[in-house]
Amino acid sequence: MLRYYKNNELILEKLDEPVTNCWIDAINPTPDEKQLLCNLGIPMDFITYSLDIDERSRIEEEDNGTTLIVVRIPYFMGENVDIPYITVPLGIILTDKYIVTVCEKSTETIEMFASGKAPKLSTTKRNRFALRILMRGTTNFLDDLRAINKTVDALEDKLYASMQNTELLEMLKYQKSYVYFAQALKQNELALYRISKLSSFKKYE
């Protein structure tokens, strides 16, 4: 799915087609949608990397200035699965005309922006927009960690009361989520450090 947005003076508006200085959000794009992005100057490799579930957080910059930022963000799979919270790669692609986000999943991080809940958001200030996405991803990690801690605390109370294997297995599920989060945050830290060193990445536009 492809979605297009551009801000006016007050709100973020959804568009029917891409225009200069818009935000393009790609969620598990089809082959035709990937080709459409390529026709807009987005490297196919950047799209492919962003959709690879095992992709690590990193930065890549082309000679023409097009930049790929890959970070891992939290994703809630549901309570009745082996690992309730995992992380997925989010690609942020910056060109001279667009900011493009690419992810296999529909995530809370991106939906907050798409819903128009982010104040003073400018699609023309692409680098700043990217930084706000990164900040939101960090906030989502904190929110999900609080939720995990709350669940684990409740499971510990049940464990002390019952000493049943069920509670132990449930706690193990959330322990796996801790591991995923720790690995992702370490990768993101290195990627953010590299962003701070990019000469082409201006923090204020």
Language model regions located:
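Peripheral, non-transmembrane regulatory/ligand-interaction domains of membrane transport proteins
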Residues: 1-204
